[in-house]
Amino acid sequence: YEDPEKQTECTNFALLVSKHFSEPFKDSNGYGESIARLSNMLGGGVIVQRFGDLIRGRRSTPKRIEENTFVPTLSATPGDLSLVLPKRILDGIIEMIYALDKIAPGTANDDTLLYGVEVKFYNMEVDVDENLESRHIGDGSGVTHSLSHASASGVYVARKIAESLEG
């Protein structure tokens, strides 16, 4: 942040885990909504948990968060993400944190704070042609799932529109 009052020594980043369902799974949106409901049920919203507590299978308490090396930068309720996230998703997050720790030592520190959960929904039902053209504007197509992909998609489509106007 440019504003010194908002600066911290912490780095915030997001780990996204995609889940693609196959038959006979019928309601992927309902599945995601149930995860969000669990989070709200257990913490009233966003839950924060120390990485060390998660690995040890224990809930983070207000006291442990207060004594933590890092001060939370987001408003959240101390809790247990393992009561919200399915095991395979949680295993993927833990595996990624350990992998990041190899290139950014300290990422897998006991005091690293994890916030959750955020559930995103993507619609893959919208038809687009080979030039990514559809009757939809923006990322309503559900083709891109990140800011970088959406940006690249926008540049590509803008070039195609410019080409069609020239010729």
Report residues per predicted region:
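A glycine-rich dinucleotide-binding beta-alpha-beta segment and adjacent secondary-structure elements
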Residues: 76-144, 151
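Structural signal for hydrophobic packing residues in well-ordered secondary-structure cores
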Residues: 55, 59, 97-104, 158-165
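A structural preference for long, well-packed, hydrophobic secondary-structure segments
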Residues: 127-132, 159-167
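Generic structural hydrophobic/aromatic packing signal, biased to beta-strands
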Residues: 13-17, 51, 114-116, 126-128, ...
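Solvent-exposed, non-transmembrane amphipathic alpha-helical segments
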Residues: 35, 71, 113, 117-120, ...
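A conserved FAD-binding loop/helix module that cradles the flavin
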Residues: 140-165
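An anion/pyrophosphate-binding glycine-rich loop and adjacent beta-alpha core
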Residues: 1-80
